[in-house]
UniProtKB/Swiss-Prot annotation:
Taxonomy of the source species: Bacteria, Pseudomonadati, Pseudomonadota, Alphaproteobacteria, Sphingomonadales
Transmembrane segments: none
A single GO cellular-component term on record: cytosolic large ribosomal subunit
GO biological process: translation
Keyword annotations from UniProtKB, A to Z: Ribonucleoprotein, Ribosomal protein
First and last residue of the signal peptide: none
Keyword flag Ribosomal protein: yes
Gene: rpmD
Record-linked Pfam families: Ribosomal_L30
Similarity comment text for this entry: Belongs to the universal ribosomal protein uL30 family.
Protein name: Large ribosomal subunit protein uL30
Assembly and binders: Part of the 50S ribosomal subunit.
Amino acid sequence: MATLKVTQIGSPIRRSPDQRATLIGLGLNKMHRTRELKDTPDVRGMLRKVAHLVKVEN
């Protein structure tokens, strides 16, 4: 299965609780943390919600 390399580039400070929870759900809780996530529709939806806070690479 394909994976996505996701890096947090934005701070969750002054963001809505939903956006903070989404970052935690993705395994990102600190700036410049990188995770390899499976490319699923669920993960894509979460990334769309916090697109302004993360950088996605294939």
